[in-house]
């Protein structure tokens, strides 16, 4: 049948009908809010390039998380650490008194209904800003795996619910899974940053986390933005190594990749709505060029419509307004 028998506008005639037939709806259970936790006390440093976000010491992180839960009902967070000191290998992140495990233990003492995802990478903890040990001017894959595995065990011991390796080393999921299992954490899931692209959208995050590389870039381990078949190979490898969830990062420029991954694999798909995507919205809204709340809603809906089961987003704290 076609027009005039079929009139597609009939199901758009009022808000109640539109809501009834809506195919995609974002809700609080879909969202994870990232936080940046910094060593020290009474620190609440505004992140200039990410309005409304802060570097928070543990004592300031706790009320911020409480506010997130109370206002929005979002009870899932992702933690990134900003340490007091760094080293050549990122070994500082493996210590039990490192900033993220310290924050996790503090949060565990306050919140019983909070899901904590711990990012696993070395870039915040190395003096050179790369994601692993440098040998001959490049990140050495296999020696880096040992650090990532040790870091994962430390965070699991501290109480992390989910381990999320973001380094893009080959074999990291298998190394982490083996280390977790050997230390009694066989029920701790791995959320792998499987298709993490060498993107220009990470700029504000690197300012926030102090993780910009001191030389070169990350194109020898993060993915080429031109490739999508490669993303499927990365996802397949991570699943075979034991990943429980897989991630595509960034989200907006890679909706096609999210869709391909969801269509190809029967596994939960996470999408990271990254700092540059967030900051573009904030900048445009500050200049009066867009309706901020409408655009945020549209972005999150498009990510879920593409196939994401879970969305990591700095907009999570604004969810109550959407």
PLM features: what roles do these ranges have?
Residues 2-3, 14, 26-32, 38-322:
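Alpha/beta enzyme core
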Residues 1-22:
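N-terminal amphipathic/basic leader segments beginning at the initiator methionine
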